[in-house]
């Protein structure tokens, strides 16, 4: 919005051209989302407490979690508001990639909101029925996937980028839609599974978003894309603004979500953030990079799949409890230790992922 306004004001005073610079807009996008999130936090927490919208804790979970019962949840609303407002202010709104991410953020946020509402307001422990949750996730993902395919059909925007092989970039055709669908839905649910401890999901989300901000900048720059042997995608650079908004909103939320948490993001936050990261990865043609940088989300998801599969096939559990962060809690690790170690691993994986862009 401000980009469009600045273009017209620059005719009167050239100083307004600063609003067209990507680096400037990336910084102020981060700061805007951070300030909005920090400002909304106390008001959101107080409002949720008045409405008695508190976390539901399972009796079969770790005993240390019983003290979390009643902690305000659905705080992901403030994350989404901060991101969306910041992006609408600082991004070029004529860019279709920006709208693809915003659609997933809003759509998955709505699905998560209904799920949380049923759990904490209607006291329905199951929340939104699983098949309906998956149905709406699928509808939104397919709408966005087909839209992205229509935008980038038969261009580098629909090629598959394989790590370590600079000359292996097959054109996917309609398989692009299927891949986009699985990445968006899968990442959304992976972040949701990870969101089980104070600050555990939000910091890896911030790290991955920061990593993708760098990738988006390189992908949208013809010279750097050529240097790194990744596809040059014309619309990609504007995703930097989206990524930095996620970073800012995430850091602002962490202020209140760090141990011991004053508020939880709930499904409204985790489903939306995961879906956004998946969408960004698809738009940048970096699905494999997402697997590396988002390795914490991948391991959390695999631990659940392995646990359920092992119990159904052998009648035995691999872990004391899944997702795997609960396994370490039950081994006696204090919650802050689990959280910080997962953060460190996440940061390492993001750096390794970025390094793979050069190892080709």
UniProtKB/Swiss-Prot annotation:
InterPro entries: Glycosyl_transferase_4, PNAcMuramoyl-5peptid_Trfase, PNAcMuramoyl-5peptid_Trfase_CS. GO terms for biological process: cell division; cell wall organization; peptidoglycan biosynthetic process; regulation of cell shape. It is found in: Cell inner membrane. Pfam families: Glycos_transf_4, MraY_sig1. Its main location: membrane. It is a multi-pass membrane protein. GO terms for cellular component: plasma membrane. It comes from the Bacteria. Its cofactor is Mg(2+). GO terms for molecular function: metal ion binding; phospho-N-acetylmuramoyl-pentapeptide-transferase activity; UDP-N-acetylmuramoyl-L-alanyl-D-glutamyl-meso-2,6-diaminopimelyl-D-alanyl-D-alanine:undecaprenyl-phosphate transferase activity. The chain crosses the membrane at residues 27-47, 73-93, 94-114, 132-152, 168-188, 199-219, 236-256, 263-283, 288-308, 338-358. The keyword Transmembrane helix applies. Catalyzes the initial step of the lipid cycle reactions in the biosynthesis of the cell wall peptidoglycan: transfers peptidoglycan precursor phospho-MurNAc-pentapeptide from UDP-MurNAc-pentapeptide onto the lipid carrier undecaprenyl phosphate, yielding undecaprenyl-pyrophosphoryl-MurNAc-pentapeptide, known as lipid I. Belongs to the glycosyltransferase 4 family. MraY subfamily. PANTHER family: PHOSPHO-N-ACETYLMURAMOYL-PENTAPEPTIDE-TRANSFERASE, PHOSPHO-N-ACETYLMURAMOYL-PENTAPEPTIDE-TRANSFERASE HOMOLOG. HAMAP family: MraY (MF_00038). This is Phospho-N-acetylmuramoyl-pentapeptide-transferase. The gene is mraY.
């Amino acid at each position: 919005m401000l980009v469009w306004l600045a273009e017209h004001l620059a005719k009167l005073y050239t100083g307004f051209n600063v609003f067209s610079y990507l680096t400037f807009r990336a910084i102020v996008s981060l700061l805007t989302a951070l300030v909005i999130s920090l400002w909304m936090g106390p008001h959101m927490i107080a409002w949720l407490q008045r409405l008695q919208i508190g976390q539901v804790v399972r009796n079969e979970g770790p005993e240390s979690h019983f003290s979390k019962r009643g902690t305000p949840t659905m705080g992901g609303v403030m994350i989404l508001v901060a991101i969306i407002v910041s992006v609408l202010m600082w991004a070029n709104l004529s860019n279709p990639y920006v709208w693809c991410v915003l659609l997933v953020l809003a759509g998955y946020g709505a699905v998560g909101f209904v799920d949380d509402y049923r759990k904490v307001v209607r006291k329905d422990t199951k929340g939104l029925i699983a098949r309906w949750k998956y149905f709406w996730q699928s509808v939104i993902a397919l709408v966005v996937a087909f839209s992205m395919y229509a935008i980038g059909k038969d261009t580098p925007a629909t090629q598959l980028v394989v790590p370590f092989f600079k000359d292996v970039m097959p054109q996917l055709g309609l398989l692009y839609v299927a891949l986009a669908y699985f990445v968006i839905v899968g990442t959304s649910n992976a972040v949701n599974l990870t969101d089980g401890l104070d600050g555990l999901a939000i910091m890896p989300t911030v790290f991955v978003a920061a990593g993708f901000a760098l990738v988006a900048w390189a992908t949208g720059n013809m010279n750097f894309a050529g240097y790194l042997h990744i596809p040059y995608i014309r619309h990609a650079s504007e995703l930097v603004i989206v990524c930095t908004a996620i970073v800012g909103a995430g850091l602002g939320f962490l202020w209140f979500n760090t141990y011991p948490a004053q508020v939880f993001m709930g499904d409204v936050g985790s489903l939306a953030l995961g879906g956004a990261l998946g969408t960004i990865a698809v738009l940048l043609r970096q699905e494999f990079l997402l697997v590396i940088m988002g390795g914490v989300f991948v391991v959390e998801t695999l631990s659940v799949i392995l646990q359920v599969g092992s119990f159904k096939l052998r009648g035995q559990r691999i872990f004391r409890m899944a997702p795997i962060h609960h396994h370490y809690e039950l081994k006696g690790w204090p919650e802050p230790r689990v959280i910080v170690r997962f953060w460190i691993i996440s940061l390492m994986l993001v750096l390794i992922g970025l390094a793979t862009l050069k190892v080709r």
